[in-house]
Amino acid sequence: MTGEKSVARIAGVNIPTNKRVLIALQYIHGIGQKNAADILEKVKIPLDRRVNQLSDAEVLQIREVIDRDYLVEGDLRRETGMNIKRLMDLGCYRGLRHRRGLPVRGQRTHTNARTRKGPAKAIAGKKK
């Protein structure tokens, strides 16, 4: 390969060309280290190969495996949102917690949970 190769685009994401393929695939929402290693194993690409060393055929193979076997990016975000919306429509406990913006998985809220609840609200006349 001579010169700088154009940016590889997989699942609608620009993959960085100077990184190892194992790391670069993790820029796609829904693909972590395990899935990236599994994809490269299916396509028979070494884990230490860099993106700019990939041929167009190899990039196409990776793209096909991801499209066929994995739920990524917009589809994954849509499905996650639909699952949360379904819980809220059911009116179950988890749905109510989502609706109220509180922790869903049983964490305490007396103290902590500031990230989920938002900034602390000042109470008038509450001074020692």
From Swiss-Prot:
<dbReference type="GO" id="GO:0015935">
    <property type="term" value="C:small ribosomal subunit"/>
</dbReference>
<dbReference type="Pfam" id="PF00416">
    <property type="entry name" value="Ribosomal_S13"/>
</dbReference>
<dbReference type="GO" id="GO:0005829">
    <property type="term" value="C:cytosol"/>
</dbReference>
<keyword id="KW-0694">RNA-binding</keyword>
<dbReference type="GO" id="GO:0019843">
    <property type="term" value="F:rRNA binding"/>
</dbReference>
<dbReference type="InterPro" id="IPR019980">
    <property type="entry name" value="Ribosomal_uS13_bac-type"/>
</dbReference>
<keyword id="KW-0820">tRNA-binding</keyword>
<keyword id="KW-0689">Ribosomal protein</keyword>
<dbReference type="GO" id="GO:0006412">
    <property type="term" value="P:translation"/>
</dbReference>
<comment type="function">
    <text>Located at the top of the head of the 30S subunit, it contacts several helices of the 16S rRNA. In the 70S ribosome it contacts the 23S rRNA (bridge B1a) and protein L5 of the 50S subunit (bridge B1b), connecting the 2 subunits; these bridges are implicated in subunit movement. Contacts the tRNAs in the A and P-sites.</text>
</comment>
<dbReference type="InterPro" id="IPR018269">
    <property type="entry name" value="Ribosomal_uS13_CS"/>
</dbReference>
<feature type="region of interest" description="Disordered">
    <location>
        <begin position="105"/>
        <end position="128"/>
    </location>
</feature>
<dbReference type="InterPro" id="IPR010979">
    <property type="entry name" value="Ribosomal_uS13-like_H2TH"/>
</dbReference>
<dbReference type="InterPro" id="IPR001892">
    <property type="entry name" value="Ribosomal_uS13"/>
</dbReference>
<comment type="similarity">
    <text>Belongs to the universal ribosomal protein uS13 family.</text>
</comment>
<dbReference type="GO" id="GO:0000049">
    <property type="term" value="F:tRNA binding"/>
</dbReference>
<keyword id="KW-0699">rRNA-binding</keyword>
<keyword id="KW-0687">Ribonucleoprotein</keyword>
<comment type="subunit">
    <text>Part of the 30S ribosomal subunit. Forms a loose heterodimer with protein S19. Forms two bridges to the 50S subunit in the 70S ribosome.</text>
</comment>
<protein>
    <recommendedName>
        <fullName>Small ribosomal subunit protein uS13</fullName>
    </recommendedName>
</protein>
<dbReference type="GO" id="GO:0003735">
    <property type="term" value="F:structural constituent of ribosome"/>
</dbReference>
<dbReference type="InterPro" id="IPR027437">
    <property type="entry name" value="Rbsml_uS13_C"/>
</dbReference>
